[in-house]
Amino acid sequence: MKRILIVTGQSGSGKSSALQVLEDLGYYCIDNLPLALLPEIVAKLDHENNLEQLALGVDVRSTRADMQEFDHVFEQLQKHGTVDVIYLTTQDQDLIARFSASRRPHPLANRFKSLLQCIHEEKQLLIPIQFCATVHIDTTDKSVHDLKHILLSKLGQSDNLIVILQSFGYKHGIPLDADYVFDVRHLPNPHWDLELRRFSGLDEPVKQFLEASPQANEMFEDILHFLKKWLPAFAEGHRHYMTISIGCTGGQHRSVYMVDRLKQALEAEWSVQVLHREMKHWS
């Protein structure tokens, strides 16, 4: 077996959706297996089936004792192939909204606990698995399409480094899956120009406004210089992806402009993917 993926994380963060994406990519997927049974089942599948890619869904319904033994389970699985642990997380307010929309109970729910208490308890239970995770994905404000896009990037089979450029708004929270975060809130803000407010950083009026700013141009050059200097080193370290997040206040103007400009400067040398996290909030 060439590759084994363990997909886990907070309930409601998109584990089932991630497994569906992986199934479409050719992975043999099994969900909701008790942790203690994983080594035995993987050994059986490896012996009796000609599987190259296996994805296993694990959640908090495993016992607390099983969770504490996860590092041992991880070592056992490594006998059968390369193992990656994908850990999905989502901000509390997004999880609450998802459970409210689906009307499904949290796995730890009972009549003595609030939903927020269940979320916080689950985080503590999952710490042993989170510690072993090799891939972290924050699914806050991300659609299933976005999740597929991120999984494709982070699980790329080639040795080519994929650069993910992500714009975001600080008022919606810092992305938890970022490798580097650049803050551009000090740049002139088009939001305060009523004629520019309705546009985004992809629109020409906002581009012209920011290109006229010496600060914006200097910030762009500094970030670009950093990336051009260090991306080759990251690639030599056999990383498949690097997530660079750039934030402004709302995630509509300055960060979007900077991401778009960096994409144009880097795409001739690197495989570049772009995510504008706050697009649904744009006015």
Curated annotation (Swiss-Prot):
Provide the alphabetized UniProt keywords: ATP-binding, GTP-binding, Nucleotide-binding
Q: List the disulfide bonds.
A: none
By its UniProt entry, which Gene3D superfamilies does this protein fall under? P-loop containing nucleotide triphosphate hydrolases (3.40.50.300)
- Carries keyword ATP-binding? yes
A Pfam family matched by this chain, by name? PapZ_C
Which ranges form a coiled coil? none
Q: Where does ATP bind?
A: 9-16
Q: Which GO terms describe its molecular function?
A: ATP binding; GTP binding
Q: Which positions are annotated as binding GTP?
A: 59-62
Q: Which domain of life is it from?
A: Bacteria
Please report which protein family the annotation says this sequence is part of. Belongs to the RapZ-like family.
User: What biological function has been recorded for the protein in this entry?
Assistant: Displays ATPase and GTPase activities.
Q: What is this protein called?
A: Nucleotide-binding protein ABSDF2931
Query: Species lineage, top-down?
Result: Bacteria, Pseudomonadati, Pseudomonadota, Gammaproteobacteria, Moraxellales
